[in-house]
């Protein structure tokens, strides 16, 4: 219906249609398709019509048309593509589709529009503690949802199954033989996929250590050693906005750490001393000696003060001193005009931070991959956004036996999985499961 912003497409995108394809795509085995012709069914003979989509998602074709017309004709329009649907099989396609729609309608780089995800929000300096050569030693980096598969199948695991990141040394392609896990502030039994496989894998490990400020399902079920981490009430720190934002909040220490709890950094520093003595301990945490484990306040103050003066004030033009910030409790940046993601690219012609300098509907990096085994992805990803059927969906043959699709959103009563064991909260609510009203009526519920 010609509702797209063709001028925006021509100026700022790569691969949206035939007219925005790069020259190299003509001879590319993986990068020869453009998004428009994919949608029209030019390549596979299947036009991606509202009727086609309705059969997949269960939303009527008429409603899809209404929503599409509303979004395309509303200027400006903010499409807030949240992260949850992307935490699914082939979830990156959902995120890429959101960005394609935003670019197609010219809603990137303008006030009232939205860039995909958090929208390249204005950000603060986020790192106060050291990142030195010892803090960043790593043997292998794998996809977080592949660890259980590795544990259960080692050594018969390929690098692509592990989602192994490439390296430039002798360890490239070496799948780790995982003997134990350090779960640091992360409730994997709640957050990752295929929990039954994880429960099976954790029983094979020789050591499981959990660091957290609450007893999560992971900590209660899996931990051989449970190290209590102090909360932000029990240590001196600075609060940064999630995910990005234009302010800082000073968090003074309110109470002494309860019981045997220590901060994460205290725990890791003490482990560094015990593993490698003074050489490794001082290298990991240059400002601390062994007394840091029992008295962290002075060292934390030194890190935070240096971070504020050397990074925040130096990089971001902040004139308020660390001492004044502590007195006031908050610092808010004054912006001359509303922050708009990619305003400079659209209004001033600055290149986007991509190989082409444009919004890459056709991804240069993906199109040029010839050996998917030697990538951090672990499997083939199409060069343009495409619909790929998840291996478990309502269109699966399994629905004959399992007709419902379970979705587990954040309950309004807690944050992810934490505080579920708080007795006061448990007295106010009971965790509930909801079912579609039409299904409930059909089943007499």
Features from the language model and the residues they span:
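Conserved short loop/turn motifs at secondary-structure junctions
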Residues: 53-56, 82-90, 120-123, 186-189
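Extended redox/cofactor-interaction regions of prokaryotic respiratory oxidoreductases
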Residues: 100-221, 231-238, 326-443
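Glycine/threonine-rich phosphate-binding loop and adjacent beta-strand/alpha-helix elements that clamp
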Residues: 233-257, 267-268, 272-274
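Flexible glycine/proline-enriched surface loops and loop-helix/loop-strand junctions
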Residues: 31-35, 47-52, 80-85, 247-256
């Amino acid at each position: 219906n010609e509702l797209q912003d063709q001028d925006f497409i021509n100026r700022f995108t790569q691969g949206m249609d035939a007219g925005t394809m790069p020259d190299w795509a003509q001879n590319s085995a993986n990068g020869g398709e453009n998004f428009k012709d994919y949608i029209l069914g030019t390549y596979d003979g299947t036009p991606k019509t509202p009727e086609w989509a309705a059969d997949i998602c269960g939303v009527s074709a008429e409603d899809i048309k209404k929503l599409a017309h509303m979004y395309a004709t509303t200027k400006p329009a903010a499409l807030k593509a949240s992260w949850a649907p992307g935490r699914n099989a082939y979830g990156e396609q959902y995120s890429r589709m959101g960005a394609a729609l935003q670019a197609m309608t010219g809603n990137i780089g303008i006030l009232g529009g939205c860039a995909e995800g958090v929208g390249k929000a204005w950000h603060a300096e986020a790192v106060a503690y050291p990142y030195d050569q010892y803090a960043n030693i790593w043997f292998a980096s794998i996809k977080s949802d592949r660890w259980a598969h590795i544990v259960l199948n080692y050594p018969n695991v390929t690098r692509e199954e592990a989602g192994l990141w490439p390296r430039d040394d002798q360890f490239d392609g070496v799948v780790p033989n995982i003997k134990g896990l350090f779960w640091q502030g992360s409730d994997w039994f709640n957050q990752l996929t295929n929990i039954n496989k994880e429960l099976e894998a954790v029983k094979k490990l020789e050591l499981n250590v959990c660091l957290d400020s609450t007893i999560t399902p992971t900590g209660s079920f899996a931990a051989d050693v449970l190290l209590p981490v102090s909360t932000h009430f029990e240590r001196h720190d600075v609060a940064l906005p999630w995910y990005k934002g234009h302010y800082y909040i000073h968090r003074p220490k309110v109470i002494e750490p309860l019981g045997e709890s220590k901060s994460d950094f205290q725990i890791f520093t003490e482990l560094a001393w015990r593993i490698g003595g003074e050489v490794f301990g001082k290298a990991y945490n240059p400002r601390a000696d062994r007394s840091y484990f029992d008295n962290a306040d002075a060292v934390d103050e030194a890190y935070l003060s240096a971070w504020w003066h050397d990074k925040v004030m130096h990089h971001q033009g902040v004139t308020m001193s660390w001492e004044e910030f502590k007195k006031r409790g908050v610092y808010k940046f004054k912006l001359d005009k509303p922050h708009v993601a990619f305003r400079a690219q659209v209004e001033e012609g600055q290149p986007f931070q991509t190989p082409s300098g444009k919004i890459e509907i056709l991804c240069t990096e993906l199109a040029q991959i010839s050996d998917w085994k030697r990538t951090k992805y672990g499997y083939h990803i199409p060069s343009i956004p495409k619909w790929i059927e998840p291996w478990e969906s309502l269109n699966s043959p399994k629905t004959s036996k399992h007709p419902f699709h379970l979705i587990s959103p954040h309950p309004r009563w807690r944050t992810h999985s934490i505080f579920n064991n708080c007795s006061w909260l448990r007295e106010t609510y009971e965790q509930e499961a909801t079912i579609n009203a039409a299904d409930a009526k059909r089943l007499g519920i």
